[in-house]
Amino acid sequence: MVFRIASSPYTHNQRQTSRIMLLVVIAALPGIAAQTWFFGWGTLFQIVLAAITALVAEAIVLRLRKQSVASHLQDYSALLTGLLLAVSIPPLAPWWMVVLGTGFAIIIAKQLYGGLGQNPFNPAMIGYVVLLISFPVQMTSWLPPYEIAATTPDMLDTLRMIFSGHTASGGDMTLLRIGIDGISQATPLDTFKTSLRAGHSVEQIMQYPIYSGALAGVGWQWVNLAWLVGGVFLLWQKAIRWHIPVSFLLTLALCAALGWLFSPATLASPQLHLLSGATMLGAFFILTDPVTASTTNHGRLIFGALAGVLVWLIRSFGGYPDGVAFAVLLANITVPLIDYYTRPRVYGHRKG
């Protein structure tokens, strides 16, 4: 059995590639705005840091490879990689982490394989996973949404936190993570998993401030809905196809519904899975990467469904609260196999 991987991305010229990448950046604006609203200025600062790092790293590698720097940077792929990594990490993560993660994504996960169209794994998720495994504490230190935060840093304090780790008054991440109830806060998925391990019931957990009056966690449901709006825009513009996001979301919802039906005391509800963490970001902006996803319609359905199952398994039984990045990379591994068995039959061709 021989695997044949067609050259990608599956667009015919640089102008078309640039247009699609730019549309994805535009579609990300609602999600970026929502994250900035609920979690502060850090999201924007991380995007700027990641974008600069991505462009500089790409330019350096292209120069070393004696390729045209200007023409390659104009496809916006490096910019998009930096953006996706930046919105995936905590807004007050140290500056060197986003630089390290973005540099690794561009230099190792993308350019080392030959550049755009040759990388088998999503570069942004490679960078994210490297950071998560190397610095788990910093990568899970999300601020509580402003609605339930005891202290919210302003623009200058946000910059100080990113570059020095302290606010002007000497506050640190431990202080800023405290909610209005006086308890250090985490993301809804992280809170759910940690509290279950501590012996709390689902009924008790859902009374925590992070879930107060919300379907899937204060702030997080609106962030996910904002990414959903961007995803619908991409579908409307035909920048992505529906197969991957629909199969991913339906499979995740089905797994979550079945799990919740049979074990409501230990497993999260479908709405928590769908509207928390990086669900919508992953469905429309990460899994749909034309370079690392399946290239056939049937293959896209299988690819999305596989990622949905993996996200549910990792969230429900794994060691990490959110499993989107790991699910994406594991699904990327299967793409050659999926494409091999879902490639349309060529009429008139017979195996000799």
UniProtKB/Swiss-Prot annotation:
EC number: 7.-.-.-
One of the record's GO cellular component terms: plasma membrane
Enzyme class, broadest EC rank: translocase
Membrane topology label: Multi-pass membrane protein
Leader sequence residues: none
Cofactor(s) of this protein: FMN
InterPro entries reported for this sequence: NqrB/RnfD, RnfD_bac
Protein location: Cell inner membrane
Positions where FMN phosphoryl threonine occurs in the chain: 187
Chief place where the protein resides: membrane
GO BP field: electron transport chain; transmembrane transport
Keyword field: Cell inner membrane, Cell membrane, Electron transport, Flavoprotein, FMN, Membrane, Phosphoprotein, Translocase, Transmembrane, Transmembrane helix, Transport
Transmembrane annotation, as ranges: 20-40, 42-62, 69-91, 123-143, 215-235, 242-262, 267-287, 301-321, 322-342
NCBIfam families, alphabetized: PRK00816.1, rnfD
PANTHER family assigned to the protein according to its UniProt record, in alphabetical order: ELECTRON TRANSPORT COMPLEX PROTEIN RNFD (PTHR30578), ION-TRANSLOCATING OXIDOREDUCTASE COMPLEX SUBUNIT D (PTHR30578:SF0)
Quaternary state and interactors: The complex is composed of six subunits: RsxA, RsxB, RsxC, RsxD, RsxE and RsxG.
Function: Part of a membrane-bound complex that couples electron transfer with translocation of ions across the membrane. Required to maintain the reduced state of SoxR.
Similarity comment: family membership: Belongs to the NqrB/RnfD family.
Name by which UniProt lists this protein: Ion-translocating oxidoreductase complex subunit D
Source species: Salmonella enteritidis PT4 (strain P125109)
Lineage of the organism: Bacteria, Pseudomonadati, Pseudomonadota, Gammaproteobacteria, Enterobacterales
Gene: rsxD
